[in-house]
Regions:
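Short S/T/G/P-rich N-terminal loop/turn motif that feeds into the first structured element of a domain
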Residues: 1-48, 58-67, 79-103
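A short, exposed loop/beta-hairpin motif centered on an aromatic-Gly-Thr core
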Residues: 52-54
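A common structural junction motif
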Residues: 71-75
Length: 103
């Protein structure tokens, strides 16, 4: 069963505009080609930064969020992220015109 991971951390002060773009230009390519990762969204507002990851399975997701990953986010964003896992029971993708039920 696929898994969504919701990763959240306090928004670093001053991370906007050109500085945010620079962080994303460095960070986004890291996620291309990771085995088991289908999609990743980089999110944020004035209070929090977040990521939504769609994984092949919960085990794949949990293996990815290791100490090295946590330390890198602590270095880049100044905080240890919180990770929550959600089982994907069904999905509708209007871009591709597909649906999937996994229960």
């Amino acid at each position: 069963m696929r898994c969504l991971a919701f990763v959240r951390f306090p928004a670093p002060a001053g991370l906007a505009g050109d500085k945010l773009r620079a962080v994303l230009e460095e960070g986004v390519p890291r996620y291309k080609g990771i085995p088991g990762l289908h999609r990743k969204y980089f999110l944020g507002n004035s209070s929090f930064g977040a990521g939504v990851y769609e994984w092949e399975s919960r085990a794949t997701a949990q293996a990815f969020y290791n100490e090295q990953w946590r330390e890198r986010l602590r270095t880049v964003y100044g905080a240890v992220p919180q990770v929550e896992y959600f089982d994907v029971h069904a999905m509708v993708d209007n871009d591709s015109g597909t649906m999937r039920i996994e229960v």
